[in-house]
Structure formats: structure tokens, C-alpha cells
A protein has these predicted regions:
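Short, non-ligating residues that shape and space the ligands of small metal-coordination modules
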Residues: 94-97, 114-116
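Rieske [2Fe-2S] iron-sulfur-binding subdomain
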Residues: 1-80, 101, 115-177
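Residues immediately within or flanking Cys/His clusters that coordinate Zn2+
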Residues: 82-85, 104
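Active-site gating/metal-coordination segments in enzymes
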Residues: 91
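Residue-level signal for short segments within beta-strands and strand-turn junctions
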Residues: 75, 85-87
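Short cysteine-rich clusters marking metal-coordination/redox-active sites
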Residues: 88, 107
Length: 177
């Protein structure tokens, strides 16, 4: 039995019961559920101004100090944003350490290069390697959505944030975001 299986909340509110108080006080139980809950959610990254003119990369942690997944916002020439893994697919080195302007993404460990879409481009001394590159050599792309100028990212979101955004827009449409 999984650690989380012992907790059940009936989806019918008439039959639902409150979780035991130990659930809220036990650090290990919190650690067991935090990734299950938050890795499946959308998180606010920032305002689009974090990528000003002459800046096309912005490294960040998914939930800094909580779920530390190194991610990278990348802005293309048309101002479109993508969220990519900021971890090299070769030796798990961080690729971009500071926001800035780059023409491609280069891992400083072994020189592996990726384009701004995260596609593998090259690696020194691997030109003659058989069955290389493979699809898994490219950087993983994560879901990204905007609410006006605000950027949200999800690792593996289990709901569509557009449903949330539509309700927010209903309430704040007068703000002209």
C-alpha cells in the first residue's frame, strides 16, 4: 500500500470526512504529498518583464526551495515563450546560470548545444557516433500559459489552466491586462 493510500476523501461532500489532524502535523506526510500535489499544478513564474529587450533566457526553479526543478524560459525572435528543462541531457549539468541573450543553449561541461527550441544541435567529438542523436537528446519542454502579462508553468499539470483563467478574466476583465 502506498503511503498516500491510507488517506481518502470521498468526492461526494455529503460522505466526506475530515483528514486526521496527524496529516497536518507530520513532516514526512507533507514530504510524501508535496510533489504529488504541487508538481501536478500550475505555478506563477513572473511578469513578462523578467525577459526584457535584449534578454531571451531566464533560468529559474519550478518552486524554489520546495520542488527544485531547474527550468528555463526562452523567448524567440517573435517574442513567443517556451519553458524548457535547464538540465543538460548528457550529464545533468545546468545549462544557463543567468538571464541573458544567447543564440543557442550550450552546456559548459562537454559543449553539448541546443537551439532555442531545446532541440539537440551538436556535441564535440560525437559526429561519427552511431544512432546519435536520438530524440531523448533534446531538452524537455514544459507547459507554459500566459494570463495577460503573467507567466505560468506546469511540470505535469493535471488540469487545464484555461478553465481557471476564464474565471479570472470574468472577474478582472475591466483591468485591461
Amino acid at each position: 500500500m502506498k503511503k498516500l493510500d491510507k488517506f481518502f476523501v470521498n468526492p461526494d461532500i455529503k460522505k466526506a470526512d475530515t483528514l486526521p489532524s496527524s496529516f497536518y502535523k507530520n513532516d514526512q506526510q507533507f514530504e510524501d504529498v508535496k510533489e504529488k500535489v504541487f508538481a501536478n499544478s500550475w505555478q506563477f513564474v513572473g511578469h513578462k518583464s523578467i525577459l526584457p529587450i535584449n534578454t531571451n533566457t531566464y533560468p529559474f526553479e519550478f518552486m524554489d526551495g520546495f520542488i527544485e526543478e531547474p527550468l528555463l524560459l526562452v523567448k524567440d525572435q517573435d517574442e513567443n515563450l517556451k519553458c524548457l528543462s535547464n538540465v543538460c541531457t548528457h550529464r545533468a549539468n545546468i545549462i544557463i546560470h543567468n538571464k541573458g541573450q544567447v543564440k543557442d543553449l550550450k552546456c559548459l561541461y562537454h559543449g553539448r548545444k541546443f537551439d532555442l527550441d531545446g532541440n539537440f544541435k551538436s556535441m564535440p567529438e560525437f559526429k561519427k557516433a552511431i544512432d546519435f542523436p536520438r530524440e531523448c537528446e533534446s531538452l524537455k519542454e514544459f507547459k507554459l500559459k500566459n494570463l495577460g502579462p503573467f507567466i505560468f508553468v506546469g511540470l505535469e499539470p493535471n488540469f487545464k489552466i484555461d478553465n481557471v483563467f476564464s474565471r479570472i478574466y470574468d472577474r478582472i476583465s475591466f483591468l485591461n491586462l
